[in-house]
Amino acid sequence: MKAKILLLVSIFFLSVTIPQAIAQGLTGRAYYKSSSQIKIAMDSTKMAPEQMAEIQAQLKKQMERDYILSFTQTESNWKQAESLGGGPATASSGGMTMVINTGSQDKILYKNLADQSFLREEEVMGKEFLIKDTLEPSEWELTSETKKIGNYTAQKATYSRIVDSQRFSTGMTEMENVKDTIRVTAWFTPEIPVSHGPDNFFGLPGLILEVQNQGRILICEKIELNPSTNPVKIEQPKKGKVVNREEFRAMQEAGMKQMMNQYQGKPGEGNQFTIRIGN
């Protein structure tokens, strides 16, 4: 009986320590593709439905992006991959030009899970900022649903929360304060035992391979684990004036108000406005 107990204890010890030992030395790169569904509601007297459909189709195509997540056990970098089409998504029809800024190629998001901190390079009205603050963990709910993503078995997790946000009124004449419910679905694989994920997402018991968030889909297409020819190096962003999360949100709000004023423009000139949706 004592021998059986010792054997069970030994098996349990190995089952716990071996994955931990593997994870402690684990590094890698995950390559993601981003796509977005664009839905923009405007006053029908300002733009015909055909014009809006044309703009939305142009933006959807241009907003496809490639990203790279580099990671160790506790740190990660998230940045856009180099490409010829890495600038803002731009569409125009009938004198209206719309620009959606999805983040510059050289902007970096750094996350440190050990001390629950992050650094993120951002830009508002041509000025560079470095957001430095604590990570906001999500209350993930794990499900039993699984599917294959590439060679990995992924498990489904979800969360939702209510946030305060601002958006343009239908006529694009003023800003409205609204309550939005954010619903996120993620698929993670315990086969890669790190709690990292694309963009702002993290905190699951395995690498997040896919995220569905408000019309945006991020999906992992390739993974390199412990690469020997090009070892993983985690870079901390340094460019820009250091601000916290709330200070940056206030600057974004001011930028949105300025954008609204620019949109109103002079009659007959045509209008251009920019929407920023994050990195």
Language model features with spans:
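Extended soluble regions of mature proteins
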Residues: G25-N279
